[in-house]
Amino acid sequence: MLKTWERDGYTVEEKHFDYDLHQFDIIKDGETIATITPGSIEEMEETIAALDAGEGVDGWEDGMGNTIRI
């Protein structure tokens, strides 16, 4: 089941990407401003655990070498 995490001013939506590997869209004001693309299932699970723990994504790397700024 894909998840959505609500944060102050934005949401993070998990989406299918490559078989069991998922991406995470960062959506602010109805627009996707960044997409986190984990490099492995382990990284995906770490991302989910961090989001489940309440972490925000500002300052995270998107998996493509870019820093996410909210």
Where are the predicted features?
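Mixed-charge, Lys/Arg-enriched low-complexity segments
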Residues: 31-70
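Short N-terminal "domain-start" leader segments
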Residues: 1-21
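Short aromatic-glycine-(Arg/Gly/Cys) micro-motifs in beta-strand/loop hairpins
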Residues: 16-32
